[in-house]
Amino acid sequence: FLDELLNQIIPQVESSLPQPPTWRGIAGYSLAGLFALWSLWQTDAFDRAASASGSLWFPDFVDRASTAPFAGSPQAVYLSLGKKETKTPNRMMRHVLDDTRAMEALLVERGIPTTLELNPGNHFAQTDLRMARGIHWILTH
């Protein structure tokens, strides 16, 4: 999907703009939130990212990210998580808060303005509001 996004979708959208954008952002929820962050290590096409309830529990993602350089120079990253997301029978997913805090620390350590918002509810609570907050945050930072 990243290839299609970079080589088809973005060029088509940007060709309709009156001028090139000054920056690009990427945002996603759950696995798409993981994808948004992963993209920062794969391409320099995105300057800002929002990951709402990102699946940062994904095996070895945070560990690999901590030892790899970014493909570009991210300017800002928004992270959010539901306060009850750790209350799950899935053992891997129980660590999502620890993994998200580790990602926040990694980004801050690398000098990237980053925020982590903890929201009421579980993974499925207020998904539209949380995505809107993440997009608003990257638009204003």
Residue ranges and their predicted role:
Residues 1-141:
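Non-catalytic cap/lid and distal C-terminal segments of serine-dependent acyl enzymes
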